[in-house]
């Protein structure tokens, strides 16, 4: 039998069936103490368990920290564990259980989200958020959900029917005070924060409320219909917006606004009932400014019958236009590289905007829809034609635009875009020539001509086709024309011979001593004529420093003469082998010489195997030697015995004499005297300093005629400096400067080829010096010859191009015209060379125009205008004269300068050379005055006698008593004859005194 033990009492449990038959008696049994369970009291206190639990918790935390620190040290393991923790368990193929790992991006997003939630929760618990509860949502816990499934209903539960309550409908009554208070609070916020408020009424009645500051206080302003380009009889309904107007008046202060303050732009201002303007002009409690009429201010709340009677104070049309302008102008503005500032007023800005608008979109009114649709409906060609006709119609207005508009480039662009091809005759002539031709090149010309005929109307496809056809024609023409430019230089080779040339004079035993050295004999004695006059003695005791730098007009070159002092230190000796390189020039057309379309290799620069030019290396110096031989190893010839103990170096400008000394080696002894005398007395005065290579070659040819044995003489080494257009003849002192090109010419016969006019070569015009100094010398010679007829006649016969150098100054041209040098030049050259005679005719006509101009700028402009015609004539003349190259350079410079100045003036830039022209003209006048002062006394006497004879002849023709007329006659005659202006002539006063006696 089952029983329940309660303490020491055991109570049996009897089934329900046995309860009826069980006897009534004592059913409680007392359990003996021995059969009872012993309950021992607890010996451990609560502190023990608390301490033990803390200890276990710390051990667990410590283990977790150790584990976390282990994984945190390795970011990859930490990320992998975090990713696995976020993965989902999935059943894979073959029944395997796998993890579906999320993407790394999602893992980082979740980590950041958890971190953010943790921070937000920490802030929340720290009390950083507002404690105001905005809403409470019911949350059902899981325990409540479990209790919901457990029912407490008894078997006697009976549902009570719900009694229906009677609903009483009540009207929604809104307190007016609450609405006004709400409106007032909202309007205060919008007023303080400058927020526009939209006021919406019935139907389409809506207005925008803003607050404006006027004299330190806020004034309410509502938008009205005229601001939207609309007109209404009643612009604002008082019945719909009275409560808003009341709220506006409560939060604004308009007492300081007077009648005279109401001006255009004040449309929509709201005034309260107690304001003076409201009481004066309004029949309603409030006043909203609409405008003015004859009676005063008009209230927008009251009806108006005729709109034209009211001057509306809404924003003016100009302000509306500017708002639209600024809106789109700011959207389309470019990137700025500077800080903008206001440099032009509104009127100038309006002019520029109008010019651009009418140039691109010409209309009568921008606001007219018909004008806009008219331009939008036409085709693109018709639109271009319309723009072109508009330009021609207003041509005078476009030309009179003031400079401040700065629209020149825009107008040029538009004119070029709408301009059509006017010269259709040329296009039709081309079509006549190529029509009915089926060749490829003729079809290509047709396509190009079609594109050019359309002008600005050509499409991009047609333009691309024309360019493609032009490219194919260019390629064809390039492949079939004779290549003379840089393309031909790619295959040009001019290698130096490795074998030394044989000089018979140096191989003859009769001319060699026992040491194998050349014996000068009589040649050495007669060489003194050259050494003493045109060479400078080098004194070793004074050092070599002053001879290291070799000057020439276009630059300097360093000699290796300093290396004659040889250091005994090996490192310093190796340093002496290093040269100073100039900027190396590539192989160009200036390096070659051609004749009859064939290369003359001996007159070209030496190249390497790959076609690159051969650059000069360090040339070591020697003492008292003549060094010859351009190919192979150089040959060292001792100086004549009389000069063996001395060292000589050619004076500046006479280094070409080393070529004549090399020719002297091959001269017969009995002819050495004539050879040296011809050089000293004939050739050197003719060549002077720094002559051209062409002149030196011509002199060598002259010597070769009298002494044919010198034609096979070997030349010294000649280096070519293309940068300064200079030829350097290397003597025994070598060259410390390296990087020059090397001339292949090895004998006098090779050099003589440079004297030919048929030779096409730039190097034959190179100087042993430079062209600028040569031009200055020619200018001085020209000025000197103006007042010395014999010198001028010699110049006209030998070098007629020198008169072109007079174009540097109007003063020189006028003096040459007065002395009739142009007339003499025409008489001399009109039959000898028609082109040169034409040059003198043009110069004479030019000088007549220059003499009529009184301002220097006008005179220089006339000279510049005549330069292109003279340059064209010069290109067809022979270049065998000394002044040809300087004159050609002068004309080229003037033409290019005029072209560049024209472009600058067109673009609005000033010409800054006016001061330079004034100073140059002043210097020329001083030079002319100096040469006039040097005129010979005999010339002055003859001139004065001629003047006296002329005065005697003309004095008889007029009344002797007329002093003034004689003075005018004398002044006219002097202006034709004298060098000076009559007003400054010293003889003028003496002649006048002689006439008056």
UniProtKB/Swiss-Prot annotation:
Q: Which GO biological process annotations does it have?
A: proteolysis; symbiont-mediated suppression of host innate immune response; transport of virus in host, cell to cell; viral translational frameshifting
Q: Where is this site: Cleavage?
A: 313-314, 769-770
The protein's UniProt keywords, in alphabetical order, are: Host cell junction, Host-virus interaction, Hydrolase, Inhibition of host innate immune response by virus, Protease, Suppressor of RNA silencing, Transport, Viral immunoevasion, Viral movement protein
Keyword Transcription among UniProt keywords: no
Q: Where is the Peptidase S30 domain?
A: 173-313
Name the EC number(s): 3.4.21.-, 3.4.22.45
InterPro entries hit by this protein: HC-pro, HC_PRO_CPD_dom, HC_PRO_CPD_sf, Pept_S30_P1_potyvir, Potyvirid-P3
Span of the annotated motif Involved in interaction with stylet and aphid transmission: 365-368
Top-level taxon of origin:
Viruses
Q: Which GO terms describe its cellular component?
A: host cell plasmodesma
Motif Involved in virions binding and aphid transmission: where?
Answer: 621-623
Per UniProt, what is one GO molecular function of this protein?
A: cysteine-type endopeptidase activity
Residues forming the Peptidase C6 domain are 647-769
State the coiled-coil residue ranges. Answer: none
Enzyme kind, highest EC tier: hydrolase
Chloroplast recorded as keyword = no
Summarize what the UniProt record says about post-translational modification.
Answer: Potyviral RNA is expressed as two polyproteins which undergo post-translational proteolytic processing. Genome polyprotein is processed by NIa-pro, P1 and HC-pro proteinases resulting in the production of at least ten individual proteins. P3N-PIPO is cleaved by P1 and HC-pro proteinases resulting in the production of three individual proteins. The P1 proteinase and the HC-pro cleave only their respective C-termini autocatalytically.
Which residues does the entry assign to the active site, renumbered to this chain?
A: 235, 267, 655, 728
Q: Which family does it belong to?
A: Belongs to the potyviridae P3N-PIPO polyprotein family.
Q: What is known of its domains?
A: The N-terminus of helper component proteinase is involved in interaction with stylets. The central part is involved in interaction with virions and the C-terminus is involved in cell-to cell movement of the virus.
Indicate what this protein is called per its UniProt record: P3N-PIPO polyprotein
């Amino acid at each position: 039998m089952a029983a329940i033990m309660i303490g020491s009492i055991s109570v049996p449990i009897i089934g329900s069936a046995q309860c009826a038959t069980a006897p009534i008696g004592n059913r409680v049994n007392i359990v003996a103490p021995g059969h009872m369970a012993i309950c021992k009291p607890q010996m451990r206190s609560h502190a023990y368990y608390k301490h033990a639990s803390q200890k276990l918790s710390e051990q667990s935390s410590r283990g977790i920290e150790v584990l976390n620190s282990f994984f945190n040290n390795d970011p990859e393991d930490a990320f992998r564990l975090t990713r696995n923790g976020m993965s989902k368990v999935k059943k894979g193929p073959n029944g395997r259980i796998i993890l579906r790992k999320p993407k790394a991006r999602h893992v980082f997003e979740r980590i950041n989200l958890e971190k953010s939630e943790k921070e937000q929760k920490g802030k929340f618990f720290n009390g950083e958020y507002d404690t105001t509860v905005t809403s409470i949502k019911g949350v059902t816990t899981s325990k409540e959900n479990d209790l919901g499934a457990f029912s407490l209903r008894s078997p006697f539960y009976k549902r009570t029917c719900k009694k229906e309550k009677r609903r009483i409908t009540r009207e929604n009554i809104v307190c007016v005070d609450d609405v006004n208070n709400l409106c007032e609070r909202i309007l205060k916020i919008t007023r303080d924060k400058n927020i526009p408020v939209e006021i919406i009424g019935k139907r389409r009645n809506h207005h925008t409320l803003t607050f404006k500051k006027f004299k330190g206080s806020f004034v309410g302003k509502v938008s009205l219909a005229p601001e939207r380009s609309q007109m209404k009889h009643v612009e604002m309904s008082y019945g719909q917006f009275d409560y808003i107007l009341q709220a506006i008046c409560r939060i604004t202060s308009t007492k300081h606004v007077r009648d005279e303050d109401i001006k255009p732009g004040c449309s929509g201002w709201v005034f309260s009932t107690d304001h003076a303007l409201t009481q004066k002009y309004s029949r309603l409690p409030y006043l909203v400014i609409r405008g003015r009429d004859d009676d005063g201010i008009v209230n927008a709340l009251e009806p108006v019958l005729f709109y034209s009677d009211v001057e509306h104070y809404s924003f003016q049309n100009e302000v509306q236009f500017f708002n639209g302008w600024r809106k789109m102008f700011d959207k389309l503005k470019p990137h700025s590289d500077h800080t903008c500032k206001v440099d032009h007023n509104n009127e100038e800005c309006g002019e520029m905007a109008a010019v651009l608008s009418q140039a691109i979109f010409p209309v009568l009114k921008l606001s007219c829809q018909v004008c806009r649709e008219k331009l939008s409906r036409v085709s693109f060609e018709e639109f271009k034609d319309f723009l072109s006709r508009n330009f021609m119609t207003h041509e005078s207005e476009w030309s009179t635009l003031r400079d401040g508009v700065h629209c020149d480039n825009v107008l040029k662009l538009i004119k070029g875009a709408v301009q059509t091809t006017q010269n259709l005759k040329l296009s039709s002539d081309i079509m006549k020539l190529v029509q009915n031709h089926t060749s490829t090149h003729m079809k290509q010309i047709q396509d190009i001509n079609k594109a050019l005929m359309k002008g600005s109307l050509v499409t991009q496809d047609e333009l691309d086709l024309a360019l493609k056809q032009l490219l194919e024609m260019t390629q064809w023409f390039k492949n079939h024309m004779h290549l003379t430019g840089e393309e031909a230089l790619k295959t040009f080779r001019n290698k130096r011979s490795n074998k030394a040339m044989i000089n018979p004079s140096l191989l003859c035993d009769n001319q060699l001593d026992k040491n194998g050295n050349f014996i000068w004999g009589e040649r050495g004695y007669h060489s003194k004529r050259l050494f003493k006059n045109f060479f400078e003695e080098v004194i070793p005791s004074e050092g070599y420093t002053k001879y290291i730098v070799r000057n020439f007009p276009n630059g300097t070159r360093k000699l290796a003469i300093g290396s004659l002092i040889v250091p005994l230190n090996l490192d310093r000796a190796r340093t002496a082998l290093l040269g100073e390189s100039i900027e190396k020039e590539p192989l160009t057309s200036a390096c070659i010489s051609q004749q009859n379309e064939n290369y003359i290799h001996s007159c070209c620069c030496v190249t390497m195997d790959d076609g690159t030019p051969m650059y000069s290396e360090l040339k070591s110096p020697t003492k008292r030697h003549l060094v010859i031989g351009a190919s192979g190893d150089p040959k060292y010839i001792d100086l004549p015995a009389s000069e063996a103990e001395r060292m000589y170096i050619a004076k500046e400008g006479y280094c070409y004499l080393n070529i004549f000394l090399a020719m002297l080696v091959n001269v017969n002894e009995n002819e050495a005297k004539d050879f040296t005398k011809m050089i000293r007395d004939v050739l050197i005065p003719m060549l002077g300093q720094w002559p051209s290579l062409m002149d030196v070659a011509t002199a060598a040819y002259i010597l070769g005629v009298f002494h044919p044995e010198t034609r096979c003489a070997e030349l010294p080494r000649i280096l070519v400096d293309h940068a300064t257009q200079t030829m350097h003849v290397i003597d025994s002192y070598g060259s410390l400067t390296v990087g020059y090109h090397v001339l292949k010419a090895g004998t006098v016969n090779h050099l003589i080829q440079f004297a030919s006019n048929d030779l096409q070569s730039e190097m034959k015009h190179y100087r042993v010096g430079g062209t600028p100094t040569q031009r200055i010398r020619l200018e001085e010679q020209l000025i000197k010859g103006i007042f010395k007829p014999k010198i001028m006649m010699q110049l006209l016969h030998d070098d007629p191009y020198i008169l072109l150098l007079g174009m540097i100054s109007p003063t020189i041209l006028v003096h040459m015209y007065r002395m009739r040098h142009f007339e003499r030049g025409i008489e001399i050259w009109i039959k000898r060379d028609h082109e040169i005679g034409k040059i003198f005719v043009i110069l004479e006509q030019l000088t007549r125009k220059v003499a009529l101009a009184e301002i220097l700028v006008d005179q220089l402009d006339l000279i510049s205008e005549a330069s292109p015609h003279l340059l064209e004539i010069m290109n067809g003349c022979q270049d065998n004269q000394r002044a040809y190259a300087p004159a050609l350079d002068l004309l080229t410079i003037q033409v290019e300068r005029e072209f560049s100045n024209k472009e600058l003036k067109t673009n609005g830039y000033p010409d800054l050379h006016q001061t330079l022209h004034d100073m140059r003209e002043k210097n020329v006048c001083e030079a002319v005055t100096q040469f006039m002062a040097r005129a010979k006394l005999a010339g002055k006497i003859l001139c004065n006698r001629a003047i006296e004879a002329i005065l005697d002849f003309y004095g008889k023709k007029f009344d002797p008593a007329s002093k003034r007329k004689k003075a005018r006659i004398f002044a006219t005659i002097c202006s034709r004859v004298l060098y000076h202006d009559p007003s400054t002539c010293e003889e003028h006063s003496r002649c006048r005194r002689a006439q008056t006696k």
